[in-house]
Amino acid sequence: MDIVLEICDYYLFDKVYADVFPKDGAVHEFLKPAIQSFSQIDFPSLPNLDSFDTNSTLISSNNFNISNVNPATIPSYLFSKIASYQDKSEIYGLAPKFFPATDFINTSFLARSNIFRETLSLFIITTIFGWLLYFIVAYLSYVFVFDKKIFNHPRYLKNQMSLEIKRATTAIPVMVLLTIPFFLLELNGYSFLYLDINECTGGYKAILWQIPKFILFTDCGIYFLHRWLHWPSVYKVLHKPHHKWIVCTPFASHAFHPVDGFFQSLPYHLYPLLFPLHKVLYLFLFTFVNFWTVMIHDGSYWSNDPVVNGTACHTVHHLYFNYNYGQFTTLWDRLGNSYRRPDDSLFVKDVKAEEEKKIWKEQTRKMEEIRGEVEGKVDDREYVEQ
């Protein structure tokens, strides 16, 4: 995110923060006592890990024995451990990397590297970008791809699209807020994100290899998180709002409970904390993920690929609840015995109206059986056909 944040700081935020939060301005004077009090807090020091005497302070290299623990040194040890993972050259805001310094770079008491400024900037940028990406991609899919015959499906809801949009637009800012800590870790050097492409970083071959690694890692993570979200106690609280949509439009793609959306995004944020990932590819993959999320909700069935977890597979998940939890592939569903092959009827084009009604009626019958098992007898949805 440092690339995006520096672009925004250079073209907009440096001046905005200088105007709204100037040094020695009213806000600064008001906050000075709190800032001074905060700066006087005696935080644990960050000792050099290489010189840390683990034998005499916290833990023996061979044993963990309570007699070896000195409680006073635990905070210092933990802080030093955390600090050892930090790449200080990647800390954002200490010096410009991609653009020259602006005239306003040092005129706000909230410097570029200030964690409160980073949090506010990230929230604004990511929320606006999330809304734009959601509306643009979902709208284009709705206009050019989405099969609007789905409006006649007996399990399409009253005012469904407006409900989907309302749910998504209110969820996105909360999902952003929940994921900001991961962006802050990246901005402060606690990730394996990098920019230079050379022999030391593996060159372009490494970048090409990162794409399938990212897909496979996140596909695995989302599968298990998604299955957990279908545990009855968790489903009722978090995941049921997304299953309100039995048949979907592209606008259902981000219509989650925000905590549900946060959990399903965790693998995307964990990957760069664990594995090397090029910064530009990182931005591309996050954009791709949003495209994919819209695509699997667009109701257009182009392929019945046995490997790719496409639109048809995800339609089966919304119709029949307990199948096809994967995001990109069918691998983990096959291994976890939760794969359900999409019905051939989904791929038949130019179906006559009467035949389509029979197909939908059979879908509804099967769906109601499983829905009753998952949610109970009471269905609080309001369908068009009621």
UniProtKB/Swiss-Prot annotation:
Motif Histidine box-1 mapped to chain: 226-230
Transmembrane portions of the chain: 120-140, 172-192, 206-226, 272-292
Source taxon at top rank: Eukaryota
GO biological process: ergosterol biosynthetic process
Record motif Histidine box-3, residues: 314-318
A single cellular component GO annotation: endoplasmic reticulum lumen
Alphabetized UniProt keyword annotations: Endoplasmic reticulum, Iron, Lipid biosynthesis, Lipid metabolism, Membrane, Oxidoreductase, Steroid biosynthesis, Steroid metabolism, Sterol biosynthesis, Sterol metabolism, Transmembrane, Transmembrane helix
The enzyme's E.C. designation: 1.14.19.20
Reaction(s) catalysed (UniProt annotation): a Delta(7)-sterol + 2 Fe(II)-[cytochrome b5] + O2 + 2 H(+) = a Delta(5),Delta(7)-sterol + 2 Fe(III)-[cytochrome b5] + 2 H2O
Entry's localization field: Endoplasmic reticulum membrane
Pathway(s) annotated for this protein in UniProt: Steroid metabolism; ergosterol biosynthesis; ergosterol from zymosterol: step 3/5
Required cofactor(s): Fe cation
A Pfam short name: FA_hydroxylase
Molecular function terms from GO: C-5 sterol desaturase activity; delta7-sterol 5(6)-desaturase activity; iron ion binding
Residues of the Fatty acid hydroxylase domain: 214-337
InterPro entries hit by this protein: Fatty_acid_hydroxylase, Sterol_Desaturase_Related
Membrane-related topology note: Multi-pass membrane protein
Induction context: Expression is repressed during spider biofilm formation.
Function, as annotated: The third module or late pathway involves the ergosterol synthesis itself through consecutive reactions that mainly occur in the endoplasmic reticulum (ER) membrane. Firstly, the squalene synthase ERG9 catalyzes the condensation of 2 farnesyl pyrophosphate moieties to form squalene, which is the precursor of all steroids.
Similarity comment text for this entry: Belongs to the sterol desaturase family.
Name of the molecule in the record: Delta(7)-sterol 5(6)-desaturase
Naturally occurring in which organism (per UniProt): Candida albicans
